[in-house]
Structure formats: C-alpha cells, structure tokens
Swiss-Prot record:
It holds the Pfam family PsbT. GO terms for cellular component: chloroplast thylakoid membrane; photosystem II reaction center. This is Photosystem II reaction center protein T. Found at the monomer-monomer interface of the photosystem II (PS II) dimer, plays a role in assembly and dimerization of PSII. PSII is a light-driven water plastoquinone oxidoreductase, using light energy to abstract electrons from H(2)O, generating a proton gradient subsequently used for ATP formation. SUPFAM superfamilies: Photosystem II reaction center protein T, PsbT. Belongs to the PsbT family. InterPro entries: PSII_PsbT, PSII_PsbT_sf.
Length: 33
C-alpha cells in the first residue's frame, strides 16, 4: 500500500501549494462578495 501513501503525500503537497498561491493572490475570476 505504498502507492496510496505516495499519492496522499503528492495530493496534500499540491493542495498546500495551491491554497498558498490562491490565498496570496486573489483570483481574477469575478468574485462577488
């Protein structure tokens, strides 16, 4: 079950990087709040 662990680590890492960039730079998509 090593593949499952590696997949989880990969997804979690990409998720952290994505959220870091997402919250640092507000998306230009029409955000209506």
């Amino acid at each position: 079950m090593e593949a499952l662990v590696y997949t989880f680590l990969l997804v979690s890492t990409l998720g952290i990087i994505f959220f870091a960039i997402f919250f640092r730079e507000p998306p230009t998509i029409s955000t209506k709040k």
